[in-house]
Amino acid sequence: MTGVKLALVAVNTMPEPRQIVADNLARVQDRIHAAAQAAGRDPASIQLVAVSKYVDAATAALLVDAACTTLGESRPQQLWEKAAAPASAGVRWHLVGRLQRNKVRRTLPLVELIHSVDSERLLAAIDETAAALSLAPRVLLEVNCSGEADKQGFSAEDARHLLAKLPTFSNVRVAGLMTMAALEGGEATAHANFAALRKLREELVSMAPPGVELKELSMGMSGDFEAGIAEGATIVRIGSLLFNGLL
């Protein structure tokens, strides 16, 4: 009987999902703040995109309750579903995963930023659709800094070649660059990949046509965002850390 009572007490004292998410968010924000300070940066210069691909719309909405209203999705279909849910009112959505051209029209009206423009053909499709819908979407060019064959994105050389053409895509604001670190190699490799993107951005900015600013660097996820911040990330994309205890 005593054991049963103890078990009941343990169940009754478990934190509610709302509290779990709020506590996880606070820990992540503390780590972002500490990483920024260690790099001599203003923590306010780094935007957290909370990636909700692991959970349903109701659980994702717990982030909004905790005052985190910028959410990201990896798949357009999941973004569409969550954006339509009443619980998602007030969310600013980012698409952080791959976007196929046949999904551009439905996605553009829903998103604040697309992180994953990985080809000139996709950029052209976004530009054409934006003109038809009277939109001016912000996008990032995805660059493959790790050299991994299974990753999407421009090579550094292709990004250089595209730079001069960017003003012709007059309905799209190319706001910066995005990359993902190599899966293997640990922290040192993540630093190297992120440093490569920062240096490429600096190079592109130095020769960019008028009106092309490339201010944003989206780099760093749950396992390597501190390396991203150390190397100059302005946006970090964090998912699983925010839902520890619920997955």
Where do the protein language model's features map onto the residues?
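Conserved alpha/beta-domain cores
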Residues: G3-F225, I229-E231, F243
